[in-house]
Amino acid sequence: MKRKMKLSLIENSVSRKTTFTKRKKGMTKKLTELVTLCGVEACAVVYSPFNSIPEAWPSREGVEDVVSKFMELSVLDRTKKMVDQETFISQRIAKEKEQLQKLRDENHNSQIRELMFGCLKGETNVYNLDGRDLQDLSLYIDKYLNGLTRRIEILIENGESSSSLPLPIVANAAAPVGFDGPMFQYHNQNQQKPVQFQYQALYDFYDQIPKKIHGFNMNMNKDSNQSMVLDLNQNLNDGEDEGIPCMDNNNYHPEIDCLATVTTAPTDVCAPNITNDL
C-alpha cells in the first residue's frame, strides 16, 4: 500500500534529487495534456540546484512567445487571476469559512422550524426560551407567513382560489344515500360557515303511509279521514322531535321550506285496497 508523503523539505539530498526528477517529469506531462486537451498556451521555466542552466518547456522559443503575449495584456488583465501561494491559501480558507457558515445557517433554520411546529403542537413551552430564540422564532414565523401569502397570490393569479376546494363533509353513522325530498336548512349557533351534510332517506317512513291508510279504512266510519290526518301529523311531529344526530352531538332540527298539504274529502279518498263504506 502506497503511504502518503509528508509535505515538507526532504532532508536527504539523494532522495530529494530523485523526487525532483520524478515530479518534474510529471509536471511536464500534465502541461502537455493541458495544452492538448484544453487548447491553451502554457510554458514552464524550472530553476534547480541540480542544473546550472534553467530548463524551459516546451522550448526556449515557446516560452518567449507565451511570455511576450502575456506582457501585451493590460495590468488589470494580467493581475486579475494572478495569485501567489499565500493568496491562494487565504482564498481557500475564506471559501471554507463561507461554506461552514452556510451549513450553520441551515442547521439553525431547521432547529427554528422544529421549534415552531413544536409550539403549534403544544410540545414546546415558549416560556422556556431565551430572548434570542424568541426573536429568531418571530422572524422565522414572519418569513413563513410571507411565503404562504406569496403562494396564495400566485394561485389567485393562475385562476385558482380556495372556493374550488371541496367543502368538508360531516359523516353520518350510517352509509349515506340519496334524498329527493324537500330542502332542509339546519342552524347551529356555533356554526359560522356552511357545512355540507349527508342525509338519510325517509323512504321507510313513507312506505308505511299506505299501510297505515289501509289499516284505517278497515274500520272506517264518518270520522275516518280525520283520524288518518291526525295520525300522519303525529308521525311527522315524532320525526321532528328526534332530530338528526351529527358529529358534534347536536341535534339539528330542520326548518322546512315547503311541506305538502294533505287535503281529504269524505268521498274522495284514494288508496290501495281501500273499501269505502260511506
Curated annotation (Swiss-Prot):
<dbReference type="GO" id="GO:0005634">
    <property type="term" value="C:nucleus"/>
</dbReference>
<keyword id="KW-0805">Transcription regulation</keyword>
<comment type="function">
    <text>Probable transcription factor involved in the development of gametophytes and seeds.</text>
</comment>
<dbReference type="InterPro" id="IPR033897">
    <property type="entry name" value="SRF-like_MADS-box"/>
</dbReference>
<keyword id="KW-0238">DNA-binding</keyword>
<dbReference type="GO" id="GO:0000981">
    <property type="term" value="F:DNA-binding transcription factor activity, RNA polymerase II-specific"/>
</dbReference>
<dbReference type="GO" id="GO:0000987">
    <property type="term" value="F:cis-regulatory region sequence-specific DNA binding"/>
</dbReference>
<comment type="subunit">
    <text>Interacts with AGL61/DIANA and AGL62.</text>
</comment>
<protein>
    <recommendedName>
        <fullName>MADS-box transcription factor PHERES 2</fullName>
    </recommendedName>
</protein>
<keyword id="KW-0804">Transcription</keyword>
<dbReference type="GO" id="GO:0045944">
    <property type="term" value="P:positive regulation of transcription by RNA polymerase II"/>
</dbReference>
<dbReference type="GO" id="GO:0003700">
    <property type="term" value="F:DNA-binding transcription factor activity"/>
</dbReference>
<dbReference type="GO" id="GO:0046983">
    <property type="term" value="F:protein dimerization activity"/>
</dbReference>
<dbReference type="InterPro" id="IPR036879">
    <property type="entry name" value="TF_MADSbox_sf"/>
</dbReference>
<dbReference type="Pfam" id="PF00319">
    <property type="entry name" value="SRF-TF"/>
</dbReference>
<dbReference type="InterPro" id="IPR002100">
    <property type="entry name" value="TF_MADSbox"/>
</dbReference>
<dbReference type="InterPro" id="IPR050142">
    <property type="entry name" value="MADS-box/MEF2_TF"/>
</dbReference>
<feature type="domain" description="MADS-box">
    <location>
        <begin position="1"/>
        <end position="60"/>
    </location>
</feature>
<keyword id="KW-0539">Nucleus</keyword>
